[in-house]
Amino acid sequence: MAMKRFPLEKYATLELNHVEFARTGNLIAQTPLGAEFTAEAPCENGMWVCADRSKGVVASIEDVNEPIGVVYTAEKEYDMYHYGLKHFGRKVAGDYPRVGILEKGDTMTTNCLQYDDGEFADEETLYEALAAWQTTPVYVVPVVGSPVPQLTATKPTEGTFGKVCKFYTVPNGERGVKYQITNI
């Protein structure tokens, strides 16, 4: 059993559908990325990170009950032929991402996800489960030690988690998942 990333071309994409932090200003923008974010493992939009400002850096989640935020740094237009979206990653330690602290009811669409191949054997099995979200719930949960949230059919009992409410595409045309935060 191993964790596998949701298929994407380069970097993950995020679309904020309805989020409270945009209205309330409950966000982090002046805290640098921790040392775990490198050129080989950059910080991407849609990642869930620890939203505890007292730690001094944006880092992976250490406890599912700590405040959790989603990275939503604005994509860049590199030039008139190369737009951000799937080609944009916040990159490495020392950079300052924008992180919105999740609230119950927040809804977003992303392909920044991972799954356990012990639960979903392959991409096709995962896609079948996501397509049946109306009859068989699929949840989005934090992963201790990883900034990439996980898709699972097992309903969590604590901490922040969301529920899939649509399986379609992200703004760059790749497959994606729309989910709503249902528990904080």
Task: Please state what every model-predicted region is.
Residues M1-I184:
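Surface-exposed, low-hydrophobicity beta-strand/loop segments enriched in small/polar/acidic residues
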